[in-house]
Design a protein with these regions (language model features):
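Cyclophilin-like peptidyl-prolyl cis-trans isomerases
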Residues: 1-186
Length: 186
């Protein structure tokens, strides 16, 4: 609603990354008060659109972590502005490789967790052949599904990250809904 953010503090500021606001308690915060835990009381459906990415100046909705919020629903009030950093072409390639390695491992771990009971059964029976077969099946499934979560930069993303900067590790993970058009030099 109009005026909601008037007088609200940016409670989370991380150099070369982002600044975040949205905690209504920040309007009456005392010095030293820990902020960031409260919000407006509702979430919004995720609207993650690949053409909107985390270049410098983008506004995006904050949210709880995937383990708590697998649907990636956005906070109804918390948002952040990307500060980010500028990457050289070589460094952006290294960053994308690191991001994709993490995403691959996370996907494999989720699939493995879904088979926890089966794994335990084979372990208790000392059935190492079945464990190896299951591991191969999980690895194959991970490779097949990975293409859906793999970060692939477009030419526009690569140009932005190597000129104005940003935070590519957030791409495909959060709802981007706006962009600062002037005033980022503050």
């Amino acid at each position: 609603r109009e005026g909601y953010y008037n007088g609200m503090l940016f409670h989370r500021v991380i150099k070369d990354f982002m600044i975040q606001t949205g905690d209504p308690d920040s309007k009456s915060a005392r010095p030293g008060m820990v902020l960031g835990a409260n919000d407006i009381g509702y979430t919004l459906k995720a609207e993650i659109v690949p053409k909107y990415f985390h270049k410098r100046g983008v506004l995006a909705a904050a949210r709880e972590a995937d383990n708590i919020n697998p649907e990636r629903s956005s906070s109804g009030s918390h948002f952040y502005i990307v500060q980010g950093r500028i990457f050289t072409p070589d460094i952006i390639d290294e960053e994308i490789e690191k991001i994709n390695n993490k995403r691959y491992t996370a996907l494999f771990n989720r699939l493995q967790q879904a088979c926890e009971g089966e794994i335990l059964k084979y372990q208790l029976a000392n059935d190492y052949e079945k464990l190896m077969q299951l591991n191969e099946k999980l690895s194959d499934t991970t490779r097949l599904l990975f293409d859906q979560v793999k970060l692939k930069l477009t030419g526009e993303q690569r140009a932005a990250y190597t000129t104005i900067g940003g935070s590519p590790h957030l791409d495909g993970e959060y709802t981007v809904f706006g962009e600062v058009i002037e005033g980022m030099e503050i």
